[in-house]
Each structure stands twice: as structure tokens, then as C-alpha cells.
């Protein structure tokens, strides 16, 4: 069974797992961009090229994106045109947590559920949905935090080996905080998606969100001994 890859903390992983999906964060850097350089503008960022390379090399067959930046929009257009993926979907999330944004996100979730369910040939399993919610684990003892731009697994491994304290990757998708609350019971699907949209948008905000004051949680930590800011 193919894994469904994602790159954004606002990806509804729990919903995908409710339809039988196995999700994995795509966060590796390739050895080069031989494939990506043939199909994308040379000015596209390294992360965008890494996504293209992973797909064009055949590693990724299922990918769910969120429109977090112009690069992702460009990557989506290129991949849609390439026809290399068995399943490709992009969720359009507004950069705020207002009521209208929650309503729009709920609509997007239902659209994804329909498309993914048809692709998988499965229906929504509420029990699997509930089981997919897991409380985030954080380092509570003295540690160092990596903040800022997304840091790939390879570079993070190097940082871990060179620091005197345990290191927590708090960049981008790695500070996903869905799972701090369990889904309420006895809700219809539409009501459940409305609740879920609120949970997704209520996470520690991405740097691209209009109100990112909630990111203070990342450094107002009594166990934090230092910060590495990745640019």
C-alpha cells in the first residue's frame, strides 16, 4: 500500500487515516535536483525542488498539499500536469482562524474526504478517526529548540549530534499540535468536520498566519536552554 505524503501541519492527517491512509511527512532532501530542474523554473526554492524530485523519481505516489506559499501552488500545478501521481490534492486554507476561515476549511475537508474516499474505495471510519488523535510529545527536560524555516531530517540529525542538550525540531510541520483535544462524540459528519476545522486552525500558528502571537508557546518554555534559528 502506498503511503500518503504531506508537508504541512494543517494537513488533516486524522481524516486521511479514517479512510485507511498511512500518512508520512515528506521532509528529506535529495542528493540533487536532476528531475526537478528539467520541469521547474530555476528560481523555485530548494524545498519545492525537493518535492518535485521525490515525485518525479517515483518515491511518492500520493501527496496532499496545503497552499501555504506560492511555491506549493507552483509545485501543485507542475505535478498535476505531470500525471506522475496516483493521488494529488491541494487544500486551500485561509491564513487566519476566523469563523469564515473555519467554515471554508470544513468545506475543504469534506471535499478531500469525498476525493480520497473515492480513490481508496473506502468510507469514513469514525473509530479510526478518533484513534488517529494522539497527544503531541514534547521534551520537558532541559533542551534546545530549532525554530524558523523548515529544517530537513538530514540537517536536524547533524544538529542533534553536535548539541550538548537534547534538541527539539519546532520548525514548520514538526510543531503540529492537533491531538490535544479528543473529538466529541455523537456528532454528524458535517458537525465533526466543523469541529475538526477549528482544531486544525487552532494549532500553534504557522509563521504565515496573520496572527502568529500563539507562537510564543514555542519559546516560553522553562526547560528551554537555547534556540537555533533556521533561515
Predicted regions and their residues:
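An N-terminal assembly and electron-transfer interface module characteristic of large anaerobic redox
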Residues: 1-231
